[in-house]
Amino acid sequence: MFDDCLIMAGGSGTRLWPASSSRLPKQFLPAAEKVSFFSMALERALALTGADGRVIIIAGKSHIPHVIADAAKLSAVEKKRLLVIGEPAAKNTAPAIACAVSLSLLRGRERNMLVLTSDHIIKPLKVFKEDAGLAAASAGGGKLAVFGIPPAHPETGYGYIETGNAAGGVYNVSAFHEKPDLQTAKKYAANRHFFWNSGMFAFNAGFMEEQFRLLAPQVYLPFEKLKKPSPEDFPSCRGVKVLSAWRGLEGAYRKTTGISFDYAIVEKCEKTVMIRANFDWIDIGNWEEYVKIRSKGGSEVFSVSAEGCYVDSDIPVALAGVEDLIVIIRSGKNGGPPSALITRRGQTQKVREIVEQIKDRGRKDLL
C-alpha cells in the first residue's frame, strides 16, 4: 500500500508527568498490558507497507534505546524493514518529515509515504487500513491527504479541519483552525463539517519535495544536500538498522528551520484533502484518560477505607481514608530525579499548570 512509512517518535510528552518525561516520553509507556504506544504504531506501520516497504523511525538520539527495546521484539524479517534515525536536535515535525522525504527520494520520486504519530491508540487495524487505502489513492493522485477525526466532544487541545464537499470518504479542505477556546470548540463539535486534526498524513515523495521547495525551502534545502548513506552508516543494533552517522545530518539540522509540518506545509498547500476516520482514535492526553485504559498500575498498594484510587508507583504505597485519587510516584531508582503526583479524579488537566510551575521555578530537571 505504501512504499515508506515514517513514525514520528520524538517529543518529550509531559502531559503524563511524572511517568512521562524527556527521559521516557509518553510513546514508550505501556498502552495495554506490556505493549507501548510506540509498539502499536510499529504494528500499524508494518501492516501498511508491503514486503519491500520500509518503516523509518525518527526519534531523539537519547530515545533510541527505547526504540530499539521495542523494535527488538519483532521478528527478524520485520526488523530488516526498519530504519531508525536519531535527530541531532528537536526541531519540530517539518524537519523530521523533510529528512524522511529526502531519504525516500533516493529510491524514487513516485514512492508513496505515510506519516504516523507514535502516541495514539488506533483500532481496529482493519478499518484503519481501509481508510489508509483512500489516503494512498489520494497521494498517488498528487494530493496531500490528512486524516480527520469526527469530534467526540468539544476539545480545546486539538486543531480543527473545516471541510467542504466530499466524495467517497475524501473531503475537500476549506480551512484549518487553531486550537480554539471552549465556546468555539463547542461550535466546531456541533458542526458536521469540522474534524480534529490527527497529525497523520499521506503523500507522494516527489510531490512533497515540490511542496517543500515552494512553501518551506528553508526547512527542506539543508536536507537536499545530504549524500546517500553508505553501508557503514547503518550499524545494526539488536537486528535493527540505526542511521547514527549519516554524514551531514547534524549540519542539516543546524541549518533547517524548526517549525511544525502543519504550519510549514499542510495549511498552505492548495492540494490538501481530508480522509474521514472510520477507525477509533484515542489521544491519551491526561491521567484521567490513561487510567481508563489501564486496569491497575504496577504497584504494591496497602489500603484501608480507600475507594476509587489508582496508584502507579515503583515503591510501596499506603492509602487510608481517601477516595478518587490518582497517585503517581517515581523514586528515581530507574533514572531521573524522584518525583510524585497526587491528584483527584476530574482534576488531572491541571497537571499542565504543574508542569508550567516546575519550568517557572527553574526545575526542568524534573521534566
Where are each of the predicted segments found?
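Conserved beta-loop-beta/alpha segment of the NTase-like Rossmann-fold superfamily
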Residues: 79-167, 202-203, 210-216
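A short, charged helix-loop
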Residues: 163-195, 243
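Left-handed beta-helix
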Residues: 207-367
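A conserved hydrophobic position in a structured secondary element of the catalytic/binding core
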Residues: 59, 116, 203, 285, ...
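Conserved N-terminal catalytic core of the sugar/cofactor nucleotidyltransferase
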Residues: 1-7, 15-25, 30-117, 123, ...
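Short loop-to-beta-strand entry elements in the cores of soluble alpha/beta enzymes
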Residues: 192-205
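Generic secondary-structure signature for well-ordered alpha-helical cores
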Residues: 43, 47, 72, 76, ...
